[in-house]
Amino acid sequence: MTPARRALLLAAGGVALGGWSGAVRAGSQVEEPLADSVRSALSAAVADSGAPPKLEFRHIDERLAFLRWLGAMSPRLAKRKPEFNVRREFLETVWYEARRAGLEPALVLGLVEVESGFRKYAISSAGARGYMQVMPFWARTIGDGDASRLFHLQTNLRFGCVILRHYLDRERGDLFLALGRYNGSRGQAPYPTMVLGARRRWEFKDGPTGAVPSAATTPSAPASRR
């Protein structure tokens, strides 16, 4: 680990310990040319059947693990989303979309905190929309062209998670660079520092070993939504 990266991670820990107390000026994802194969893959990844979402689990242990996570996250989010049903729907969708894209739910929650402060209809000065501040050009590039759908809960989280996964793949797994690219500030420390710090506040330890459940340690998504 380089000294600069070590300093970044220490700073992220400091942000987490100090708490979050201010608005963030969201950057803007940069529209870049996409190869046809990449565009097709991303379009397929964000495709939505439009059916009502329903979590399904292969084993009872997976369901119990999800319920423990949900029980831990719900109180943490209560001040931001006081209505229980709204809060539960949001967390269920984060859980599914994060793991569908091979991301940690804690990372997605941290990014949402920094990007929008958990405001569904947030709009940045650059025009980014919704919880994960997705730029409208993505709706045209890999979606159906309707940018207003980016305010829909599942659509916004699906686009955001797929885009972050795309950037992680482009950066060969380097989270620091991928987060910077997501914000339009690749190579600069402030934004990744804030997201990494926020992620700390949404981590969940489960099981006898105290391991933090991670999409990276799960070969496939544990649940499906229909």
Residue locations for each model-derived region?
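Boundary of Sec targeting at the N-terminus
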Residues: 27-29
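N-terminal secretory signal peptides and thylakoid transit peptides that target proteins
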Residues: 1-15
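Extreme N-terminal leader/anchor segments
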Residues: 32-33
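Catalytic glycan-binding domains that act on GlcNAc-containing polysaccharides
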Residues: 49-226
